[in-house]
Regions:
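N-terminal leader/targeting segments and the immediate start of mature chains
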Residues: 2-81, 236, 240-248
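Generic short beta-strand segments
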Residues: 56-63, 90-92, 184-190
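Short, surface-exposed coil-to-beta transition loops
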Residues: 68-74, 95-101, 193-199, 219-223
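N-terminal beta-strand/beta-hairpin edge segment
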Residues: 70-115
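Short, solvent-exposed aromatic-acidic interface loops
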Residues: 89-97, 215-221, 242-247
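Acidic/charged, solvent-exposed loop-and-adjacent secondary-structure segments enriched in E/D, K/R, S/T
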Residues: 110-155
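Short amphipathic beta-strand and strand-loop transition segments with alternating hydrophobic
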Residues: 162-175
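Gly/Pro-enriched, hydrophobic low-complexity segments
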Residues: 177-241
C-alpha cells in the first residue's frame, strides 16, 4: 500500500504549472477598463521583482486526465532564490481530502502524504497520516525552486505591453479581503509559451499588486491567487518527532 501511495504521490507532484487555467468569483462593481494594459504592466513588474511569493492555483479541468489525478488546488510558497519552498496539493474525492505535502529546508526535502475524512472532526477526521520522510535535496534550486515556478507562470502570461491593443471590461470587487479591480479581456491573450491564454486578472485597488490571474489551456481552467509578495514566512522543517528516522 505504501508503495502505491508513493507512486501516486510522485505522479501527482508531476503536475506542470504550464497547465494552469482559470475561474474566479465574478462580483459586480464600477471601474474603467481603459487602463487594463497599464494595470497589467505594473502588476506584472511587481511580481517579477518580488523576492518571495505565495501562489495558490485552483484547477477546473474538463480535459481527459489519461488516468492522472488532477489536484483541486496547489499551494506553493517561498523565496524566489530557491533556498526553501513549501508545496501542498489537495485532492477531494469520495468524501476524502488527500494532501501531498513537501518542504525544502536547508538542503533537505521533507515529504508526506495524508488523507482526511471531509466533514469529520477531532479523532474521526484523520484517515491516514504518514510521517515526514527526509532526503537530501540535490536539485538545482534555480531550476526547481520558487523562482522557477514564478518564471513558469510569467512565461505563460502576456509580457509587459502584451495587452496594449486588447479591450477589457473592469469590475470593482472584493478580493483577498481588499478592494480590487478585475479586468476581463474581450479575447484570451497568450504569452510566449503557447497553449496557455490569459482571460482575466485582478489587481489591488490600493497599490496595483497582482492578486489573481485567470487562464485557460486545453480544457483546463483555474485561478492563480498571489499573495505575501516579499512577506512569505520562512519555511520551517517539520518537528523532529514527526520525521521518520532513517535506518543506520
Amino acid at each position: 500500500m505504501r508503495q502505491c501511495q508513493t507512486q501516486t504521490r510522485r505522479t501527482r507532484r508531476g503536475l506542470s504549472l504550464a497547465a494552469v487555467g482559470a475561474a474566479a468569483l465574478l462580483l459586480t462593481g464600477c471601474a474603467s477598463g481603459d487602463d487594463a494594459p497599464g494595470a497589467w504592466d505594473r502588476a506584472r513588474t511587481q511580481l517579477e521583482e518580488a523576492d518571495s511569493v505565495r501562489m495558490v492555483t485552483e484547477l477546473r479541468s474538463e480535459a481527459p486526465s489519461n488516468g492522472r489525478a488532477v489536484p483541486d488546488s496547489v499551494d506553493i510558497s517561498g523565496p524566489v532564490d530557491g533556498s526553501s519552498m513549501r508545496y501542498v496539493s489537495v485532492y477531494q474525492d469520495d468524501g476524502l481530502i488527500t494532501r501531498d505535502e513537501s518542504r525544502i529546508v536547508d538542503g533537505t526535502a521533507y515529504s508526506r502524504f495524508t488523507v482526511e475524512r471531509a466533514g469529520a472532526s477531532g479523532e474521526d477526521r484523520p484517515a491516514y497520516v504518514e510521517r515526514w520522510t527526509a532526503t537530501p535535496y540535490e536539485s538545482d534550486p534555480r531550476a526547481t525552486g520558487m523562482g522557477a515556478m514564478v518564471s513558469s507562470l510569467l512565461g505563460s502570461l502576456p509580457e509587459s505591453g502584451g495587452l496594449d491593443d486588447v479591450e477589457a471590461d473592469a469590475d470593482g470587487i472584493r478580493r483577498s479581503g481588499q478592494d480590487a479591480i478585475r479586468y476581463v479581456l474581450d479575447e484570451p491573450v497568450s504569452g510566449p509559451q503557447e497553449g496557455v491564454a490569459l482571460t482575466a486578472f485582478t489587481v489591488s485597488k490600493e497599490d496595483g499588486r497582482l492578486l489573481t490571474v485567470e487562464t485557460e489551456s486545453a480544457g483546463t481552467k483555474a485561478v492563480v491567487t498571489l499573495s505575501e509578495m516579499g512577506e512569505v514566512d520562512p519555511v520551517q522543517a517539520p518537528p523532529a518527532d514527526e520525521v521518520l528516522k532513517q535506518d543506520g
